[in-house]
Swiss-Prot record:
The chain crosses the membrane at residues 29-49, 53-73, 119-139, 170-190, 194-214, 222-242. HAMAP family: CobS. The keyword Thylakoid does not apply. GO terms for biological process: cobalamin biosynthetic process. Its EC number is 2.7.8.26. Joins adenosylcobinamide-GDP and alpha-ribazole to generate adenosylcobalamin (Ado-cobalamin). Also synthesizes adenosylcobalamin 5'-phosphate from adenosylcobinamide-GDP and alpha-ribazole 5'-phosphate. Its cofactor is Mg(2+). InterPro entries: CobS. This is Adenosylcobinamide-GDP ribazoletransferase. It comes from Mycolicibacterium vanbaalenii (strain DSM 7251 / JCM 13017 / BCRC 16820 / KCTC 9966 / NRRL B-24157 / PYR-1) (Mycobacterium vanbaalenii). It is found in: Cell membrane.
Length: 243
């Protein structure tokens, strides 16, 4: 258990750990990923609280600072995955061509637009939704990664990370984390049903994205997981900001 938690923090954050993340990524690390997400959620919630205290409730600057800290704390890994995935989905050709675009590493117009829109929406939604909602949104993003690695989901050809994590998560693990984050979302909004509904909707949208990527690329990659995380976080943040 300790090694899985250590691996989750090494994989998902900039925190120094005894073992390199690349040597530990697997079933246990993915199962523990929402725990690392909870730590990131606490960090993000704290930054938003401090920013709101300094600049006023609903300040866009507080939201921007929160997003910036999350980017630094995760090395920008997930937003880079979103960029590469959107560029790959935007190209024509067979799966091999799309995967080549994904692995090229050069941000195209689709990817740049997706990153800009995501960061803008997250910043504004975080500012409006409050610190508790930010915590839920960040954790939900990590739960989406667990769900994307459930059994039956293949890895794309040539994907190192995809081969390590695809199909490693029993469905009950993904379901358990989903129920946990949905339950935690109950007191976040004035309407008790809103939080769980938003979490379910965000995870459903993520599942749809992953399913489309499996059809387009033949399976998942590390970039697809990053895209699923960012999409889930963004949708959850927006939904929880609705009054």
């Amino acid at each position: 258990m300790i090694s899985s938690l250590t691996g989750a923090f090494a994989f998902a954050t900039v925190l120094p750990t005894p073992t390199r993340a690349t040597a530990m990524v697997g079933r246990g690390v993915l199962t523990a990923l929402p725990v690392a997400g909870a730590a990131l959620g606490v960090l993000a919630a704290g930054v938003l609280w401090a920013g709101s205290w300094a600049f006023g409730d609903g300040s866009a600057l507080a939201g921007v600072l929160t997003v910036a800290v999350l980017l630094l704390a995760t090395r920008g890994l997930h937003i880079d995955g979103l960029s590469d995935t959107v560029d790959a989905l935007g190209c024509y050709g067979p799966p091999e061509r799309a995967l080549a675009v994904m692995r090229d590493g050069t941000a195209g117009p689709f990817g740049v637009a997706a990153v800009a829109a995501t960061l803008l929406v997250q910043s504004l939604a975080f500012a409006q939704s409050g610190w508790a909602a930010v915590f839920i949104a960040v954790v939900a993003g990590r739960v989406a990664v667990v769900a994307a690695c459930r059994r039956g989901v293949p890895a794309a050809a040539g994907s190192t990370l995809g081969a390590l994590v695809s199909g490693t998560q029993p469905r009950w693990v993904a379901a358990g984390w989903t129920v946990a984050v949905a339950a935690a979302a109950v007191p976040v909004c004035a309407r008790p049903w809103q939080g769980p509904l938003v979490v379910a909707l965000a995870l459903a949208c993520s599942a749809g994205l992953v399913a489309h990527c499996v059809r387009r690329f033949g399976g998942i990659t590390g970039d697809v997981l990053g895209a699923a995380l960012e999409v889930t976080t963004t949708i959850a943040a927006v939904g929880l900001a609705v009054r």
